[in-house]
Amino acid sequence: MKEIQFKRAELEDKEVISHYFKHHTSRSCERTFANVYLWSRQYPVKWAIVEDALVFKSEDESHLAFAYPAGEPENVKKALEVLMEYSKERGIPFQMYNVTPDNFDMLEEWYPGRFQIEYNRDLADYVYEAEKLATLSGKKLHGKRNHINKFKTMYEGRWSYESVTKENLEDLSLIHI
């Protein structure tokens, strides 16, 4: 099997990655270039184009998983075949994340009964109304208000709002959440 050239997302990759996201939409926060770029500084996430499908790989010493590929269905299926072989060659069970119900339907059509889907609430996106999040109004956001107020008190005089520029972009990777 030809070796896949996975790499960390860099600013010059934005056009390619965004092209696939634009044409193969998802409501997941993981399908935005900003998210991919920033989190790849914190976590072992890399990307590659495999069979004309965009693939993300998360791998460390103890785990290997792939995001469901972004691409035309026939290319996604070809990419999945390559990724399953990639996992098999390493002796690691094939796993995917960021699989939507529609994606799972495609998997069932291509590979009946081969996969099981498990929902992991800890990895779910949170959706807020923009106005409520901006103002932190309402009972549901009380905890968020408290966290922000605690932060402001603890770090008084040591924090600021700044525009993100090329000069300070890499500093964002120093933020540990």
Please report, for each region that a protein language model flagged, where it lies by residue:
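Conserved donor-binding loop and adjoining core beta-sheet/short helix segment
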Residues: 19, 29-102
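Sequence-level motif detector for i,i+2 pairs with an aromatic at +2
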Residues: 12, 43, 61, 121-124, ...
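Residues in flexible loops and secondary-structure boundaries
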Residues: 14, 29, 63, 134-136, ...
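Generic N-terminal amphipathic/basic segments
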Residues: 1-38
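Conserved small/polar residues in nucleotide/adenosyl-binding loops
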Residues: 175-177
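Acyl-donor-binding surface of acyltransferase catalytic domains
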Residues: 71-167
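A short beta-loop-alpha structural element at the N-terminal edge
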Residues: 3-16, 138-139, 160-172
